[in-house]
Regions:
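Conserved HGGG/HGGXW glycine-rich cap/lid loop of the alpha/beta-hydrolase fold
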Residues: 18-74
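Flexible "cap/lid" loop of the alpha/beta hydrolase fold
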Residues: 126, 130-172, 208-209
């Protein structure tokens, strides 16, 4: 795994109820700006790196740890909801990324981008995005989420992952090298997200704050974003791996509702920036280049 380069700048927000850690990667002459939303909820931005830093080769990229995860943890036990995340994003944009808005969301971050856009369209958030890049978006409805949960559980309990777990248990690695054992344990915990479980070794490790994840999903209730998404008029790209445990049908329904450009990746699960980085880069770069006039005027 290549090291994560230091950001151009970093700090914490001063306008959110809880200070949120942010960082930005800025090229010498950025064409425009992107706000990148990590998955989870309850995770942090670093597991998107270093692979997604191709986004910062031509554009300023702002990333932040959403409330309750990473370096934005809080001792406040007030439940964090999807409204919390949308309100935080609104404040982060006003403080750190004023001007024409491009949201790049991965997994839960893509769903957050959609929730924010719906709220913005109703006048309950900040500015409307000029464009959206949605990478392997989280399920767009409770029904699609149930399908994902069942498929991920099936993969994790399947013979391939179970054989890898048995090999780890028999290896003696826990005693010989506890750090390597923890790394391998992490890899096996996310193996079901990948088309090839061995590729999990190339993902930067991360932790999810369970209470944040639980309270956020619970706050969505029996959700279905698709009818509301059909009312939006925003240029978008939806990228999804064909072997993602999140149903391709969910991503396709989001794309249909938005009238979005699509890119379905073969031999790819939920982590395209690890599994198919070249194809991902080509699709995202082409979309951003084609729509640059929307943010540069």
């Amino acid at each position: 795994m290549p090291p994560i380069p230091p950001p151009t700048r970093e700090g914490v927000t001063t306008t959110t109820p809880v200070p949120l850690h942010w960082c930005r990667y800025t090229p010498t002459a950025p064409r425009s700006g992107l706000v990148v939303l990590h998955g989870g909820p309850g995770a942090h931005h670093e597991y998107l790196l270093p692979q997604l830093l191709f986004l910062a080769e031509a554009r300023d990229c702002l990333l932040y740890d959403q409330r309750g995860g990473g370096r934005s943890k809080t001792d406040d036990r007030t439940p964090i909801t999807w409204h919390t995340h949308v309100d935080d994003l609104t404040a982060v944009l006003a403080e750190c990324a004023p001007g024409p808005l491009t949201l790049v969301g991965y997994s839960w971050g893509a769903l957050l981008a959609l929730l924010y856009t719906l709220e913005a369209s109703a006048g309950r958030a900040g500015p409307m995005p000029a464009r959206l890049v949605l990478l392997d978006p989280a399920p767009a409805s409770r029904a699609f989420r149930a399908t994902f949960e069942a498929e991920f559980a099936r993969r994790q309990a399947g013979p391939e992952v179970q054989a890898l777990r048995a090999a780890l248990d028999a290896s003696g690695l826990r005693e010989r090298d506890p750090a390597a054992y923890r790394q391998r344990t992490f890899e096996l915990s996310v193996a079901g997200y990948f088309a090839d479980p061995d590729r999990a070794r190339d993902l930067t490790p991360f932790r999810v704050t369970g209470r944040v994840q639980q309270s956020t999903w619970e706050s969505l209730g029996d959700f279905d974003l698709l009818p509301a998404l059909r009312t939006l008029r925003v240029p978008a790209l939806v990228v999804h791996g064909r072997q993602d445990p999140i149903p391709l049908a969910s991503a396709a329904a989001v794309a249909e509702a938005l009238g979005a450009r699509t890119c379905w990746l073969d031999d790819c699960g939920h982590v395209p920036y690890v599994e198919q980085p070249a194809a991902l880069r080509e699709a995202v770069t082409r979309f951003l280049d084609d729509t640059e006039g929307l943010v540069t005027g």
